[in-house]
Design a protein with these regions (language model features):
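A short coil-to-beta-strand element that immediately follows conserved catalytic motifs
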Residues: 51-53, 135-137, 186-192, 262-274, ...
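Dinucleotide-binding Rossmann-like beta1-alpha1 core, especially the glycine-rich loop
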Residues: 2-93, 215-217, 257
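Short beta-strand to alpha-helix junction loop
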Residues: 21-24, 58-67, 107-126, 241-249
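C-terminal catalytic lobe of FAD-dependent flavoproteins
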Residues: 117, 255-352
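Mid-domain beta-loop-alpha active-site segment that forms a flexible
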Residues: 105-127, 171-173, 249-256, 303, ...
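Active-site lid/adjacent beta-loop-alpha segment flanking the redox-cofactor pocket in flavoenzymes
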Residues: 199-296
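Central helical "cap/lid" subdomain
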Residues: 157-206
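Helical element adjacent to the flavin cofactor pocket in flavoenzyme catalytic cores
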Residues: 101, 106-165
């Protein structure tokens, strides 16, 4: 899964109402994380995710203005604090932004930003272990299926672990796990490059995460900046291919940054890395729920681009299905596996 030790984003600016609701629960969970985790950190400082409430700013072209306004209206109807800024208002609020080719921008004025991904992961792990969960550092090499159920899991060391319910949360390798039962899902690894850079000229004020028309995003990371984009040759990658292409920054990212934020005329890359999105090629949305034939095989896949921020709601949904056999809080039925088999996309357009 594409994730880093750098703070990762969360944002309810989706084209799909259910994704807005999922992320709204995410911000509620993130804000209450310290209190929820306190019992698992006795005698220690209450953990904090360092949430930076700077917002997201989606740049909007003249051709996309009507659709952007409609998305903002939908998001606000669900309680999100998104606002549409026309070209003049956008320049007034963010004077360092080049708006000449923009109709405006969609900006999350509250409850949007980024947080410490490793803090979230470590909190989850600590709480799970305290509740009796055992983590096994091993690779799954096979699944035994009998009477339409996964009965055991074979590990690379030869061990066999019995199975009551199997949740496929294997990220970019989700299809490899599905194939062990003869199933197929359109989730494949797609390479994404991230670059941390220094700028000779600072950007004043409270800078949001800016998503350019080109698909390039950039946001502050302390005194530095974090940026990335969708590579021009985007497509399924080898599972073990993490080679980075530095020309992606020189040829595509930097020109886009300089055009949108003229202060970025002199930059120096300080750090870079490559990770994999678990990319659902059908509709850019997650897959959540049991398989209709292999009854104890559950999917929780395909969320990259919005995975970390949606993990609290998806984790809760998975737990509800295991415990009660149905969703109890937020109905994630539209993410069901059956839409994959029927080739019925449930599209999400706002994925970075």
């Amino acid at each position: 899964m594409f994730c880093t030790s750098f703070p990762r984003p969360r944002c309810p600016q989706y084209s799909n109402p259910i994704n807005v609701k999922i992320s709204q629960f995410g911000i509620e969970f993130i804000r209450g994380f310290g209190e929820a985790m306190a019992p698992y950190f006795p005698g220690e400082a209450t953990p904090s995710l360092g949430f930076r409430d700077h917002g997201y700013l989606y740049c909007v072209s003249p051709e996309g203005a009507d659709a952007a306004r409609a998305r903002v209206e939908m998001q606000r109807s669900l309680g999100a604090h998104t606002v549409y800024l026309d070209q003049g208002a956008l320049k007034d609020r963010f004077p360092w932004l080049n708006v000449e080719d923009l109709a405006g921008g969609s900006w999350g004025s509250k409850d949007e930003g980024w947080f410490d991904s490793m803090g979230l992961l470590n909190g989850f792990r600590r709480a799970a272990r305290a509740e009796g969960v055992e983590y096994i550092d091993n690779a799954v090499t096979g699944l035994e299926v009998e009477d339409d159920r996964v009965t055991s899991v074979k590990l690379s060391t030869g061990e066999v672990v019995s199975c009551g319910t199997l949740v496929n949360a294997a990220g970019p390798r989700a299809q490899q796990v599905a194939a062990m039962t003869g199933l197929s899902i359109p989730v494949m690894p797609h390479k994404r490059y991230s670059f941390v850079f220094a700028s000779e000229t600072p950007v004043p004020g409270r800078m949001p995460n800016v998503i350019d028309l080109s698909g390039t995003f950039v946001r502050p990371e302390g005194e530095l900046f974090l940026t990335g984009n969708t590579p021009l040759d985007d497509g399924p990658a080898d599972f073990d291919d993490f080679a980075i292409r530095h020309d992606e920054f020189e040829d595509r990212i930097w020109p886009a940054l300089w055009h949108r934020i003229p202060a970025f005329d002199a930059l120096r890359v300080m750090q870079s890395w490559c990770g994999h999105y678990e990319y659902n090629m059908l509709d850019h949305n997650g897959i959540v729920g049991f398989h209709p034939q292999i009854r104890n095989f559950m999917f929780a896949n395909g969320f990259s681009g919005h995975g970390l921020q949606q993990s609290p709601a998806v984790g809760r949904a998975v737990s509800e299905l295991i415990l009660y056999g149905a969703f109890q809080t937020l109905d994630l039925t539209p993410f069901r596996y059956e839409r994959i088999a029927a080739n019925e996309p449930f599209l999400e357009e706002a994925v970075i």
